[in-house]
Amino acid sequence: MAKVRILSDRVANQIAAGEVIERPAAVVKELVENALDAGATRIEVEFRHGGRSLMRVEDNGSGMSRDDALLALERHATSKISEAADLDRLGSYGFRGEALPSIASVSRFELQTREAGQNVGTEVLVSGGKLVHVRDCGRPVGTRIEVAQLFNSVPARRKFLKSDQTEAAHIVQCVRLYALACPGTAFSLIEDGRVIFRSPECPTLAERIAEIFGRQTAESLVPIESVESGMRLGGLIGRPGVGRGTRHEMIVFVNQRPVDSRTLNYALIESYYESVPKGRYPLAFVFFECDPAAVDVNVHPAKREVRFRNEPAVRSFVIRSVLQRLREIADHRSDFAQPSADNMPKPESPGAPAAHGRKDDAPAAHAEGRAATPLAAGNLIVTARFGAESTPYLEKSGAIAGARPAGVLPPAVPRIPAAPMPVNAGAAAVPAPLKPASPSWRFVGLAHGNYALFETTAGLILLDRRAAHERVWFERLQEQFRSGAVPSQRLLLPVPVELDPIAAALLLDRVQFLNAHGFEIAEFGRNFFRIEAVPAWMEPADAEPFLRDLLGAFREGHWPDRDANLAREELARLASVKAVRLPAVTGEQELRALVTHLFATRTPMTNPAGRPTYIELNHAELARRFQK
């Protein structure tokens, strides 16, 4: 066994960097926190090539003297705390004194700083942990730190960095969080010479959200304020029904620090259980405050996670506060929802269309909120919900088309043939699928509007209508994408979309791909876009929500950028969910047609997400269940 020895400061700093500096965004985080702790009211962040080649953070904070600038590069040197008890009354973002020496050990690190009362500033240059020079420089009060060639001295770490685009998205997200945490501080963010956002000092959180996320997002929020037993919950939360496809706009702060808190996140999700659709996440920018001694911010190397001393109490408080606010919103709405005798809707004459393009005797909508008329036998059961309030569309020829009747497919969309598709010879062996519906399949009934029950000579078949439709649509769209023949409908009134800077950058990088697959999306100013055409299978009302969900998939990394075929498959998977429109009333012929279409696909056993489309209960299984 080798002898025990004390590591050099350079090696120790590089090891610490592995814990604290995991990617370029972590560098930006540490430098922005230092700027805020220095009392800065203006912070500018600039980076290039995802932070690999350059990151620069400049502030107008208090600055440092020459001695402090050199001491800040020593391990565990900090001005934030002086004893362990200070952790129980922590009022700063940083406190360990590890960040600057760790960053300097794995990069080319240049620091320029000047404190008030000094005639000249100080410049310190460190390369790979080695001090190159210390000299005077001219600069205004404040600090500028430039980090270049990150991880050049540690190639093993550099090769694990993601693409420039991914690393840039993390940096933008980081700066955005601290801009939200401190609305009174002006923030600028520049990527490769392009301004991502520039937000002046904002008097309110709502104005900062409008600057960063867009006015549309800000208008979807309502304030929340609750105080109880030394805990305070403030900020802005989404109105009932307003949800997002990802958690990127469910942001929590603990004592002004942006954190990932399972306790707070799950409390928000539980509070909105009945207020947002299933599979969606609430929109929230909430600030939780408590005694610093009641929360531990020292449980994670990068201080991303916190631990509460009494987590059940915190969770209950947040749930009660949010539910109470949502009830207040609902009660306020109900005050305006009561129609008077003067403005009650007048009865229509028989056969006359009712308001919103529906007839009085139309069947009630399914739980999905869509009424429909089934297709004739032999056609796939899909519906549309175009009404008088829907946006009309233009065919490619330019002629205005009326609203599609419920259940009618656009004529340009080819139907899947009834004949089964061949299975690849080299495919892995799978259980033989059931035979398509035949006269021996006796339709029993439809349960809960979605599950079709068939009786066969072998037992019972329970078919999930939605899952079956998704599989059929998935393979239909895949075929369209492969052939390049994607019919689209041009909108008479383009749909305006305002995005946050990250989403806008992601969309710009992929807009050409989307335009080749049925969309027409055009940039219309900074972070503004117009959807001018959508695929024929999509209703115009779904265009903006679908685009936002798609951008959420981009941001989560669920999008293969380098493989066009995989990208088309992912687009078809997301689109198949939106394309399905379940009619409220379905007959036996329509269900048999659906089964025929399902077994004409390559993988009829599951939907695109891998869930089963049907369940077979044979006689043996039924006997076992009934203990015969």
From Swiss-Prot:
GO terms for molecular function: ATP binding; ATP hydrolysis activity; ATP-dependent DNA damage sensor activity; mismatched DNA binding. Transmembrane segments: none annotated. The keyword DNA repair applies. It holds the Pfam family MutL_C. InterPro entries: DNA_mismatch_repair_CS, DNA_mismatch_repair_MutL, DNA_mismatch_S5_2-like, HATPase_C_sf, MutL/Mlh/PMS, MutL/Mlh/Pms-like, MutL_C, MutL_C_dimsub. Residues 357-367 have a biased composition (Basic and acidic residues). GO terms for cellular component: mismatch repair complex. GO terms for biological process: mismatch repair. This protein is involved in the repair of mismatches in DNA. It is required for dam-dependent methyl-directed DNA mismatch repair. May act as a 'molecular matchmaker', a protein that promotes the formation of a stable complex between two or more DNA-binding proteins in an ATP-dependent manner without itself being part of a final effector complex. Belongs to the DNA mismatch repair MutL/HexB family. This is DNA mismatch repair protein MutL.
